[in-house]
Amino acid sequence: MNDKHLPDASAENPWLPLRQLTPARIALGRTGTSLPTRPQLDFQYAHAQARDAVHLPFDHAAISDGLRQRGRDSLLLHSAAADRHVYLQRPDLGRRLDEASVQRLREHAAGYDGQIDLAIVVADGLSALAVQRHTLPFLERLEEQALAEGWSLSPVVLVEQGRVAVADEIGELLRAKMSVILIGERPGLSSPDSLGLYFTWAPRVGLTDAYRNCISNVRLEGLSYGMAAHRLLYLMREACRRQLSGVNLKDEAEVQALEGEAPRTGNFLLARD
């Protein structure tokens, strides 16, 4: 038998150089007609990370301690979803606070003097890992810029078993002009720790997603903390000027290089020296 025309048992993909530009699963190579062992194991590991991110307990104490060290207050609340099982089965319960949390927030709001421009909410969502990794460094960038512009911020409200819409109820109870919720996004196979920001003008119970603006994939391998804060502040300024948010408010913030960040070319395929 002549083996001269048989393909190599193991062959690399010609797109291999592109792997340095993206964590996406491209140019994995092959062994015979299948994937090599390493990509197979990496896929299984990524799938396990994504599953773990969904079920990882929310370490709110670590976030609260980090905020306290920076002189920031926090308030711990709980959604109407009693535990993780209920949270995953009943999304509607994750969108509202439980009765004890409503009462606590009302008492806090009653003792607060002055207008809150932005209610800041942090919820575990579908990835507590994302919240624990990125909340403190992102808030440091946001608060630095927001306070420099004269915005008044609420204490950071931490919500266990929270969904995006829980920020509407919190913003309404605090009588805030705007709200933003930092929440763990649904894990992907290359991004188990992606943080999402959802911004709303005039938050109140009953709003739909059409009234929210989303800034997604906030993490070291995605949208930087500084750029995410830059985009959020743009939305805040425009929302106050136009008295709206959501589909009628487009994110037209200028994308520019921030200090310590590489300039963006607009095309990830164009390698930079």
Swiss-Prot record:
Binds between the large and small subunits. It is an enzyme of class 4 (lyase). Catalyzes the deamination of various vicinal amino-alcohols to oxo compounds. Allows this organism to utilize ethanolamine as the sole source of nitrogen and carbon in the presence of external vitamin B12. Pathway: Amine and polyamine degradation; ethanolamine degradation. Adenosylcob(III)alamin binds at residues 164, 185, 214. Its cofactor is adenosylcob(III)alamin. It is found in: Bacterial microcompartment. This is Ethanolamine ammonia-lyase small subunit. One of its GO terms (molecular function) is cobalamin binding. It comes from Pseudomonas aeruginosa (strain UCBPP-PA14).
